[in-house]
Swiss-Prot record:
Annotated family: Belongs to the phosphoglycerate mutase family. BPG-dependent PGAM subfamily.
Catalytic activity: (2R)-2-phosphoglycerate = (2R)-3-phosphoglycerate
Binding site for substrate: 8-15, 21-22, 60, 87-90, 98, 114-115, 183-184
Residues with site note (Transition state stabilizer): H182
Keywords: Gluconeogenesis, Glycolysis, Isomerase
Enzyme class, broadest EC rank: isomerase
Enzyme Commission identifier(s): 5.4.2.11
Official protein name in the record: 2,3-bisphosphoglycerate-dependent phosphoglycerate mutase
Free-text function comment from the UniProt entry: Catalyzes the interconversion of 2-phosphoglycerate and 3-phosphoglycerate.
Active-site residues from the entry: H9 (tele-phosphohistidine intermediate), E87 (proton donor/acceptor)
Underlying gene: gpmA
UniProt keyword annotation of Repeat present: no
């Protein structure tokens, strides 16, 4: 049985402030640093090791991965930083407070923007400083690849081919892989691995800093998954993520 580990970055400073983050590049909070270290400790305790790691081009995921690998004594393994694993782009919502946005537009609308499969938030203008085309890390991407906004369906459209064409060949070659990414890029991957319907994906929330272990069968299809750590703590963390888009 093949195993692959997914981990959402630890709490970021914008998670702490309950802001829509998307492709905005913010760092980890103190709590997020501790979450990442704890995730690494859980993996080490459970006897995991890795040959290669994948993460996004965003600081919060890269730092999380480094902290996990440091806890495990694995900072030396190769790491690929890939924009395809970035968080979904939240468009014109990036930088706005989720609770205040719920006050303005209503909780139902914010839940649709946050959790629906195919309804994107309002788009950015290309002149907006938040447009990824202004960021040097994306200078090699085509205009078509640079989002003005994204729904989860758009995120699936970049994450799943990356899994199939880049990550899965490494797994098939026998490499032990860890992926450190984001709430929605991981929701996109989990949707694919677990064959979750467009409707049911609305209720899926992924907690920060908690390793999610997938078991794959001989055909590299997911047959089991489990969070490492205390089940009650996992449940509470999922509920906290779900409540972020509600009015105060």
């Amino acid at each position: 049985m093949t195993k692959v580990v997914l981990i959402r970055h630890g709490e970021s400073v914008w998670n702490k402030e309950n802001l829509f983050t998307g492709w905005a590049d913010v760092t980890l909070s103190e709590k997020g640093i501790e979450e990442a270290k704890a995730g690494g400790a859980e993996l080490k305790k459970a006897g995991f090791t890795f040959d290669k790691a994948y993460t996004s081009t965003l600081t919060r995921a890269i730092k999380t991965l480094n902290l996990v690998l440091e806890e495990m004594g694995l900072l030396w393994i190769p790491v690929d930083k890939c924009w395809q694993l970035n968080e979904r782009h939240y468009g014109a919502l990036q930088g706005l407070n989720k609770s205040q946005t719920a006050e303005k537009y209503g909780e139902d609308q914010v839940k649709i923007w946050r959790r629906s499969y195919d309804t994107p938030p309002p788009a950015l203008e290309k002149s907006d400083e938040r447009y990824p085309g202004h960021d040097p890390r994306y200078k090699n991407l085509s205009e078509k690849e640079l989002p003005l906004t994204e729904c989860l369906k758009d995120t699936v459209a970049r994450v799943v081919p990356f899994w199939e064409n880049v990550i899965l060949p490494d797994i098939k070659a026998g490499k032990k892989i860890i992926i450190a990414a984001h709430g929605n890029s991981l929701r996109a991957l989990v949707k694919y691995l677990d064959n979750i319907s467009d409707a049911d994906i609305t209720e899926l929330n992924i907690p920060t800093g908690m390793p999610l272990v997938y078991e794959l069968d001989d055909n590299f299809k997911a047959v089991n998954k489990q969070y490492l750590g205390d089940p009650e703590a996992v449940k509470k963390a999922m509920e906290a993520v779900a409540n972020q888009g509600k009015k105060k």
